C-alpha cells in the first residue's frame, strides 16, 4: 500500500546526518518487494532491479528539522518530508515495485535514497556521482504530478566574522556590527547590479541574509553573519567568492557549499517519455526551473545524461509547518512515473 508505506517513512525522523533508521527501513521494504537492496558506504538506501540500460532514480531521505505531526486529513498526508522529499522517493519505490511485479521492466533501475541533501555537503550525491554512469536520471523532488523540473540554480554560502577592540558607542569609528551590515549591503548591491535588466529569477543572483548576530565579552566586540546566494547558469561559485572577498570590510570570510547552476535539455527520450505519460494520465505537462538547489546540481555535470526532477507535491510547502502531500496526486504521480519508465526502457533498449 503506497499510502501506508509513505506514512511509515514519515513517522521515522531523519534530519540530515541522522538518516540511519529510515535507510534501514527502506532497505527492508525494498528487499521484501524483490529489490537487491543495501545501505551503501555513505549511508544511502539503495535498491536495484532489472537488467539493461541503467536508469538512476536519485531521491533523498533526509529532511530539515521541525516536527510536523503525521496525520491524514481531507485526503492529505501531513508530515515532515511528505513533500521534500520522502514523498517523491516513495513514488520511486512504488512505481518500480509495480513494474517489477507486472513484468514490465526493460531497464535496470537503481533507486538511491540519498543522505544529507538538505545539508551543504550533499554527501549522498557526491558518493554516487563516480559510481554510476546512467543512461538517464530522475531526481526525486516535488514538481507536481504534471510538471517536470529541468533545472536548479547554483548556490554559494558566505560566513563572515568581524572583531575589534571594544570602544565607546559615542566614538567616531564604525561599530563592528556596522561592518557586518556594510558587507551585507555591498553583497546585495553587487547582486542588484548584476540583475539589472534580467527579468527571470532563474537568471538572477538571489542573496538572502540567513543569520546575523553581534556581541561583546567586555574587551572585544564581534559580529557574525551568514549569507546564502542562489546563482544563475553563468556565475561560477569560485569566481563569485573571489569577487566578494574584496568587499570583506576587514572581516574573516569563509565560503562553502558552492555548486554551479544546472539546466537539463528537454529534447531527449526521458523528457518525451514523461510528456507522453502525463498526457496519458489526463494532464497537460509543463516545465519548471527552480530557484533552489538539488542533487541534480551535483550529478548532472558529471553524468551528462538526460535528467529531470519529478515528484508529487507543492514545493511552496517545503520546510513549512504545514507540509503535506495530496494523496490523489501522490498516487497519480506513481502512475505517471511507472508509465514514463516503461516507455523509456522500451526506447533505450
Predicted regions and their residues:
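Short glycine-aspartate micro-motif
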Residues: 54-56, 77, 135-139, 157-159, ...
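Acidic/histidine-rich catalytic neighborhood of metal-dependent amide-processing enzymes
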Residues: 90-153, 349
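Active-site nucleophile and cofactor-binding loops and adjacent substrate-binding regions
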Residues: 77-85, 286-292
Amino acid at each position: 500500500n503506497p499510502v501506508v508505506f509513505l506514512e511509515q517513512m514519515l513517522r521515522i525522523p531523519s534530519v540530515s546526518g541522522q538518516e540511519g533508521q529510515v535507510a534501514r527501513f527502506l532497505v527492508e521494504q525494498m528487499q521484501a518487494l524483490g529489490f537487491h537492496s543495501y545501505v551503501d558506504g555513505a549511508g544511502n538506501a539503495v535498491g536495484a532491479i532489472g537488467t539493461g540500460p541503467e536508469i538512476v532514480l536519485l531521491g533523498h531521505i533526509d529532511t530539515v528539522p521541525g516536527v510536523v505531526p503525521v496525520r491524514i486529513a481531507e485526503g492529505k498526508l501531513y508530515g515532515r518530508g511528505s513533500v521534500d522529499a520522502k514523498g517523491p522517493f516513495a513514488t520511486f519505490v512504488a512505481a518500480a515495485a509495480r513494474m517489477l511485479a507486472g513484468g514490465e521492466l526493460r531497464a535496470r533501475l537503481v533507486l538511491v535514497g540519498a543522505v544529507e541533501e538538505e545539508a551543504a555537503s550533499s554527501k549522498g550525491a557526491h558518493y554516487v556521482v563516480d559510481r554510476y554512469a546512467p543512461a538517464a536520471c530522475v531526481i526525486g523532488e516535488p514538481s507536481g504530478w504534471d510538471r517536470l523540473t529541468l533545472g536548479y540554480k547554483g548556490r554559494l554560502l558566505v560566513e563572515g566574522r568581524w572583531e575589534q577592540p571594544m570602544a565607546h558607542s559615542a566614538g567616531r569609528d564604525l561599530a563592528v556590527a556596522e561592518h557586518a551590515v556594510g558587507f551585507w549591503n555591498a553583497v546585495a548591491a553587487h547582486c542588484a547590479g548584476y540583475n539589472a535588466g534580467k527579468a527571470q529569477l532563474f537568471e538572477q543572483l538571489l542573496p538572502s541574509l540567513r543569520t546575523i548576530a553581534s556581541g561583546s565579552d567586555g574587551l572585544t566586540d564581534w559580529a557574525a553573519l551568514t549569507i546564502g546566494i542562489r546563482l544563475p547558469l553563468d556565475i561560477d561559485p569560485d569566481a563569485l567568492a573571489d569577487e566578494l572577498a574584496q568587499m570583506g570590510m576587514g572581516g574573516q570570510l569563509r565560503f562553502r557549499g558552492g555548486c554551479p547552476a544546472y539546466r537539463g535539455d528537454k529534447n531527449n527520450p526521458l523528457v518525451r517519455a514523461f510528456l507522453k505519460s502525463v498526457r496519458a494520465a489526463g494532464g497537460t505537462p509543463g516545465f519548471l526551473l527552480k530557484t533552489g538547489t538539488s542533487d541534480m546540481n551535483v550529478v548532472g555535470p558529471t553524468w551528462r545524461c538526460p535528467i529531470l526532477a519529478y515528484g508529487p507535491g507543492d514545493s511552496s510547502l517545503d520546510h513549512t509547518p504545514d507540509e503535506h502531500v495530496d494523496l490523489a496526486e501522490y498516487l497519480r504521480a506513481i502512475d505517471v512515473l511507472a508509465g514514463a519508465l516503461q516507455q523509456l526502457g522500451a526506447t533505450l533498449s
